[in-house]
Structure formats: C-alpha cells, structure tokens
Amino acid sequence: MALSDSIGDFLTRIRNAQLAMHRATRVLFSKMNSSILEILKEEGYILDYEKQVVDNLPSFIVKLKYYEKSPVISDIVRVSKPGCRRYSKYKDISKAYNGLGIFIISTPKGVMTDYNAHKLKVGGEVLCRVF
C-alpha cells in the first residue's frame, strides 16, 4: 500500500510513540524525513536518529527524548497537507507558541526552522509545527 502523505505518517509515528512512552520508533526513509529529523535533533526535540536497512527497506530509528518522564514533544502537527498546501512569505511567518515551538518550512534554500527562514528572508511551504 502506497502512502499518500509520508510526512504525515512520519509525524504520526513520532507522536504516537511519544504518547506510548517508547524509547525509540521506526519511521520511513526519505530525504525530507531526514531533513526534518536533523532539525528536530538540532533543536533538542529528539536524542538521535540512525538509518537502518531491514529486508532491503531503508528506514530511520528515532531515539525519542523525555524530560522528567514527560515527552519533550508535546505537540507535533502537520500544517501543509497534500489536499491543502500552506505557503508563507518570510514576513508572514509567525513564531510558533510565542517562540516556545518551531515551524519547519521547506524553502528553495532547503528545509529549515521558521527562525532561520525569517533570518534568511525566504518563505516556503510550512510543513509542520512542533512544540
């Protein structure tokens, strides 16, 4: 069965694993997922991730992060969906949760956080919101 929204599946797997208090979860491999995972790691939302190949299918093992037995990621939501894309100019990019969270944006200069997109004065597709 083919996925119509691999990013949505990726975010849902992370959300469900954190709610179930799992130490790690497996997500599908893609360049976009790799870019999002790198941002989540840099911003401190996950501990680490590594690529694995099982039965000739590449995937990532994501090591989830907790603080005092609570998930670090309290909210991770897909913003731009396949049926309704959301784009934003750099001037219109607001801070997620008054600066406590981040938006992850796909721009012509690569996938980056809302802060970096605003700093580089570049807009793009708002992929997800993390808090």
From Swiss-Prot:
Transmembrane segments: none annotated. Keywords: Ribonucleoprotein, Ribosomal protein, RNA-binding, rRNA-binding. GO terms for biological process: translation. It holds the Pfam family Ribosomal_S8. InterPro entries: Ribosomal_uS8, Ribosomal_uS8_CS, Ribosomal_uS8_sf. The keyword Chaperone does not apply. One of its GO terms (molecular function) is structural constituent of ribosome. GO terms for cellular component: ribonucleoprotein complex; ribosome. Belongs to the universal ribosomal protein uS8 family. One of the primary rRNA binding proteins, it binds directly to 16S rRNA central domain where it helps coordinate assembly of the platform of the 30S subunit. This is Small ribosomal subunit protein uS8.
